[in-house]
Amino acid sequence: MANRIRKLAQIFFLLLFLGLFLHARFPYESGWPSDIFLRTSPLAALTTALSARTWIASMLPAVLLLLLTIPLGRFFCGWICPLGTVIDGSDRCLRRGKSSAGRESVRFRSWKFFILVALLCAALFSWQAAWFFDPLVMLTRVLTVSLYPAMALLTQGLFQFGLASGMAEEQWYTLYAWMQTWLLPVQSTSFEQSIPVLLLFTGVLALGLVSRRFWCRNLCPLGALLGLFSRFRVFGRSVDQNCTSCSLCQRRCRMNAIEDDYTITDSAECIQCNECATVCKPQAISYRFGWRKSQGRIDLSRRRFIQATATGIVGLAATRVGAGNRNEIGRLIRPPGALAEEAFLDRCIRCQACVRICSSTGACLQPALTQGGWEGVWSPRAVMRTGYCEYNCTLCGEICPTGAIGKLDLAVKQQNKMGTAYFDKSRCIPWYRLEDCLVCEEHCPLPEKAIRFDEREVRTPQGEMRTVKFPYVREDLCIGCGICENKCPVVGQAAIFVTTAGEERQQAAPPAGA
């Protein structure tokens, strides 16, 4: 019965995670916090606090989870974690027909503690790297830039096929309108880093071919952190004298947490899934409250600890040395309200929550690659040729779980300078063809218009006299929203482009949620 309840809980929390993910769209109602799962990650909370050198109040749910882990053990991994649920489902498909003849090897178990120490050490030196391994961040990221756009593309193709068939057109249109309200994106969006993000996620699932929950057992640093706190639990597995030593519980344990002495459970590995009690024929296993000393040991020797520390320091040095291209840095435009670059990278966990919600408005945010150096990989940047920063939108700051993007009032945001637009006169139609083009000025959202015209009479190469409106940018008014670059009719590279010149970034910010 308990095992069935756990499975229902897993399904519920996965659906809740997906529902909150879909809720992150314009118009966004923050009464349903779409970032609550991200703010529940103790790994993201700890590494971000260490890297930013400040407590981030919005991550308080992560502290609550750690406090619950002390008496209850790693219940989050077995009952709540949405990535764990996805891995369980994937393992059922990948390992169909496979069974374990005995306890599997534990030689890789120390890797997750190695990764955890390396991440914490790097965070102490102000390098935020937990985003690559955090399961909640990983699932949010792959949904945003890979799975959700692919689902939307396939669904739209299905509707086009249905409409082309000529049958039940009215019903197709009704269904499509409903799905576009709740499920489908407002507009089709593609992301530059969708393939690498998808490959990482696929690799995590493919590890199930090696063993059940290989990622959770051996690589997940969040599981390692929860495992450290769960060693003091007062609720857990208990085996009575009815045990016949049949080893079925050990063979069915998805976390390899049951020792060769079947009465001993590694408290740092057990995820309270209750599967061992379900398969125990003499019903010798139960889960109950009661003080119990820590069983099992953290398999991380002094040598491995030193190696993990060195790995974190070397990783920090490698990313800091790998500077970005100077030209690309000049086009590395951050979202409005972003902290100063160093503080921004310290806090940003690369969850792509801002990218997700931006795709329902101006759709300018994309995950970066190395435009700002290796330290900035997968951090959000504005690519104005694919989108623009909506003048009446502040959603990226509202949904950021760590405060890397500050919350701005609309009036403040509309004056916040992301950068400055410049004309490439060798491509601009009025400048090189001597023909009027008003597109950029017409789309400029500022009431006073940051793009103006210098109207002059000129002679064409054919000797004809004509009056041409030559556009120019009022740099003191331009906020760098990028809609001019996005709407520029010139094929290929736009004739007007936004750079970081004059950008306004917050030098210091109060802790997120304060």
List the model feature ranges, each with a label:
Residues 1-263, 267-269, 274-514:
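Non-ligating segments of multi-cofactor redox enzymes
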